[in-house]
């Protein structure tokens, strides 16, 4: 009877450790997915090619735990595949939110100020 209790206790501990490892692994995969999407979005957002600021666009980039974008990204609408970029930005927001929830990430809930678009030296900039 005592050996059955020890075996059961060992099994429960192993199960709990395995579950924790799976959660950590899952969170790691969520973070990797978010990082990949962020890299892809940055690669898609081409700030060059516009001739005036009116051709530049701006969007939120990523997700803060309290909500809203963690930063903003600017690009030239003439040289950027806007539809693909917006889809990637939406996927990035969802991926970061899922990762943040999985790890219980908290934030100071500070507002990320929306920058103004600028056209400097032939490039769209968020300042």
Question: What does each model-found stretch correspond to?
Answer:
Residues 20-127:
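Exposed, flexible binding/inhibitory loops of compact, secreted disulfide-stabilized domains
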Residues 1-10:
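Bacterial N-terminal signal peptides that target proteins for export
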Residues 9-18:
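Bacterial N-terminal signal peptides
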């Amino acid at each position: 009877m005592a050996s059955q209790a020890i075996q059961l206790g060992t099994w429960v501990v192993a199960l709990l450790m395995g579950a924790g490892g799976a959660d950590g692994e899952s969170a790691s995969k969520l973070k990797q997915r978010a990082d990949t999407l962020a890299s892809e979005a940055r690669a898609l957002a081409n700030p060059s090619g516009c001739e005036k600021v009116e051709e530049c666009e701006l969007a939120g980039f990523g997700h803060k735990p309290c909500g809203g974008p963690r930063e903003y990204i600017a690009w030239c609408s003439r040289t950027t595949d806007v539809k693909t970029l917006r889809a990637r930005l939406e996927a990035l927001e969802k991926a970061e939110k899922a990762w943040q929830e999985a790890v219980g990430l908290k934030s100071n809930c500070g507002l990320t100020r929306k920058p103004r678009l600028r056209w400097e030296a032939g490039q769209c900039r968020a300042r």
